[in-house]
Amino acid sequence: MAKKGSISSRNLRISDQIQKDLAEMIQRELRDPRLGLVTLQSVALTPDYAHAKVYFTVLGAEAAEAEAILNEKAGYLHSLLYKRLHIHTVPTLRFFHDTSVEHAIEMSKLINEANATRSKDD
């Protein structure tokens, strides 16, 4: 039995499958030129599988606009997902722009600057 607060292996498997299927559907079914190149980073499911937070990054488009478009199309993507997945409850989808990549780049820049300053002082 899983510990309280831990994510079950079934939850992880379903999250991974949803991520793969959604990535394919966004690329093949939406074909919205305003989206640019969308990459799904992760899917977080609630324990009852009723809701999914889908985190994405985007290239070639404004993140806020891409988030709005994806959330607008969430119902359509949900219906496509329902046809693909063979589970009792297909979660409602909510899309969020993942800013962790930008934060990692910023942190890397700061570390490089600190190292450059330190080497000048030596």
Swiss-Prot record:
Keyword Cytoplasm appears in the UniProt entry: yes
One cellular-component annotation, GO: cytosol
Record has Lipid biosynthesis as a keyword: no
Gene Ontology BP terms: maturation of SSU-rRNA
Annotated GO MF terms: ribosomal small subunit binding
Domain of life, source organism: Bacteria
InterPro entries tied to this protein: KH_dom-like_a/b, RbfA, RbfA_dom_sf
Protein's cellular compartments: Cytoplasm
Keywords from the UniProt entry: Cytoplasm, Ribosome biogenesis
Alphabetical list of Pfam families matching this protein: RBFA
Family, similarity comment: Belongs to the RbfA family.
Subunit structure comment from the entry: Monomer. Binds 30S ribosomal subunits, but not 50S ribosomal subunits or 70S ribosomes.
Functional note: One of several proteins that assist in the late maturation steps of the functional core of the 30S ribosomal subunit. Associates with free 30S ribosomal subunits (but not with 30S subunits that are part of 70S ribosomes or polysomes). Required for efficient processing of 16S rRNA. May interact with the 5'-terminal helix region of 16S rRNA.
Protein name: Ribosome-binding factor A
Gene behind this protein: rbfA
